[in-house]
């Protein structure tokens, strides 16, 4: 993807006969739009709260497992070796299950974050296309592909305002 962008830029600037002199090229900062749009902020807040809640839940479970382990260690000399082994294996299974659950929740939150990013990009595409056609713009580049540019050709704030009007929130459930 990175090489494709570089190739496009090289072709764009190496063959000026293919581009009219009145080409209107602008850029937007996609990262800023994703992070500062109302829908993006709401999605980030939702995911942050979900992660915080899940972390609290898992911390409580971890504390219970540690207490169970300490109890088992204190009972080691009291109970039979077979019973100790049996309880130790049960505790290990609980620990493994706990770790798997924690990983599944982390993966779920990551997937929801990616889904939110895709939904924002999907909503942004028609907005950009409409804005480009209304303002006779030839090309809009992402800020991270632009090395140096004048601030006058930055459409980020304008596009951000339009996106905030058209997209209030994102469904993550």
Predicted regions and their residues:
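Amphipathic alpha-helical segments
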Residues: 23-146, 166-173
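A short, glycine/Asx- and small/polar-enriched loop/turn
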Residues: 152-155
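Sec/Tat signal peptide C-region and signal peptidase I cleavage site
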Residues: 17-22
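Sec-dependent N-terminal signal peptides
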Residues: 4-14
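Long low-complexity intrinsically disordered regions
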Residues: 2-4, 173
């Amino acid at each position: 993807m990175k090489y494709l962008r570089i190739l496009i830029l090289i072709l764009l600037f190496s063959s000026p006969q293919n581009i009219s002199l009145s080409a209107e090229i602008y850029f937007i900062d996609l990262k800023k739009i994703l992070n500062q749009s109302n829908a993006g902020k709401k999605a980030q807040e939702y995911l942050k709260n979900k992660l915080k809640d899940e972390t609290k839940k898992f911390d409580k479970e971890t504390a219970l497992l540690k207490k169970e382990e300490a109890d088992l260690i204190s009972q080691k000399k009291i109970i039979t070796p077979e019973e100790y082994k049996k309880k130790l294996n049960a505790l290990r299974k609980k620990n493994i299950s706990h770790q798997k659950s924690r990983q599944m929740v982390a993966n779920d939150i990551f997937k929801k974050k990616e889904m939110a990013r895709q939904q924002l990009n999907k909503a942004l595409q028609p907005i950009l296309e409409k804005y480009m056609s209304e303002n006779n713009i030839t090309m809009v580049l992402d800020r991270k592909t632009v090395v140096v540019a004048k601030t006058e050709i930055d459409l980020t704030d304008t596009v951000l305002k339009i996106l905030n009007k058209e997209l209030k929130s994102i469904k993550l459930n």
